[in-house]
Amino acid sequence: IPNYLRSPDNTWFGLSKRARVIVVHNEKIADGDITRIEELADPKWKGKICSRPGSHVYNRGIMASVLAALGEEKAEKWAKDMVANFAKRPQGNDRAQVKAIHEGECEIALINNYYFGKLKFSEDPEQRKWAESVRLVFPNQAEGDRGAHVNISGGGIAKFSKNKEEAQKLLEFLTSEKAQKLYGEINFEYPANLKIEPGDELKSW
């Protein structure tokens, strides 16, 4: 597990990575129309964007990412301008945003990448239809740009744990090749262990 996926004092480390990506309507948004997260603030998308509530940790994470990249003044303007483009009041989870695009309420949203996989391979045929109507855009991918914002799922051992040895074995297993591949195959998350390649489905995105 690389240093950038660990806490400075090694009290926790990442087990998997989830990209916060743009999801767009397959037919209404052309390839190349949106390539950067900053472009969600463009007034041409007024009434086109859906979102879950800004108070959710996923959106707090992307806001922190933009703040770090642009600085406070520009980040605040970006947030206000993007909110002005909302098609409706923020509501629901990430899956609900894909459903809203499918149903024509909006054309663009932000989701964690693994929700797309969950919908694409859902046992519910209706949810598979939602996934079929959209595609993912990994933002800020141009040379020299910062790339998509990534959240992690992580693990650590509680200070007063009575089972530290067993807990350590569990965490070690979760970073093993077998477990890291399961993160991708079952939950469509990217491995934190750099020795493990993402699965074919993740690579195809």
Name each region found by the language model:
Residues 38-41, 67, 79, 98, ...:
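Non-transmembrane alpha-helical segments in soluble domains
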Residues 1-22, 38, 50:
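A structural signal for short loop-to-beta-strand junctions that line the ligand-binding cleft
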Residues 12, 38-41, 125-149, 158-160, ...:
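Short beta-strand->loop
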Residues 50, 54, 58-61, 65-139:
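Ligand-binding pocket segment of bilobal, Venus flytrap-like solute-binding proteins
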Residues 5-7, 13-17, 42-44, 102-103, ...:
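Extracellular/periplasmic catalytic domains that process cell-envelope and extracellular macromolecules
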